[in-house]
């Protein structure tokens, strides 16, 4: 009886392995025929150290990542000389959330990328944004002891028109990269 059960498990494991291998092979073949584009400039992404780049080197050098010091409420960058923990906006305006964090300064390249992502069906950009959020803010998210990533819902009519909720796609990628639970509403 035990031998039959092991044989079934081995067969199931082999099936899963072959399916995963086929999916990986199809993805790699698709990447060769239709190489992914840089989520900032739209150029073809090359390889670095045998792996496909997430972003082209020129755009990577131009992106402004937000590090410390940052506002303890909304995550906006603060000047290195600031002794305050909050930006001006957060001292004069009440927010309906506890904490926020931003990965990038909202400069031209990112503005255009976000616009393409939201309004021109560039769903594939979610992987880049999710990975960057995990890399740049993962330690902070871990420090906050977050156990669930919940995307901001969209108005139903907007989501029907667009076909997807970009916050949901990023939340899925972020949770995958940080091994957190994610729920979609």
Label each residue range with its predicted role.
Residues 1-183:
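Glycine-rich phosphate/pyrophosphate-handling loop used in enzymes and phosphotransfer proteins
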């Amino acid at each position: 009886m035990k031998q039959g059960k092991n044989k079934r498990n081995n067969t199931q494991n082999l099936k899963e392995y072959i399916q995963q291998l086929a999916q990986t092979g199809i993805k790699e073949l698709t990447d060769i025929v239709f190489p992914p584009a840089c989520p900032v400039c739209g150029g073809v992404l090359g390889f670095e150290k045998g792996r496909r780049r997430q972003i082209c080197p020129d755009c990577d050098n131009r992106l402004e990542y937000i590090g410390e010091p940052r506002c303890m409420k909304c995550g906006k960058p603060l000047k290195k000389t600031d002794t305050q923990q909050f930006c001006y906006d957060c001292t004069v305006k009440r927010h309906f959330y506890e904490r926020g964090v931003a990965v990038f300064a909202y400069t031209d390249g990112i503005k255009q990328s976000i616009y393409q992502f939201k309004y021109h069906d560039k769903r594939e950009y979610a992987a880049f944004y999710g990975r960057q959020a995990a890399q740049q803010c993962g330690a902070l998210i871990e420090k906050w002891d977050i156990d669930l990533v919940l995307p901001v819902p969209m108005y139903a009519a907007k989501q029907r028109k667009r076909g997807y909720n970009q916050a949901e796609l990023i939340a899925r990628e972020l949770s995958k990269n940080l091994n957190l639970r994610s729920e979609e509403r």
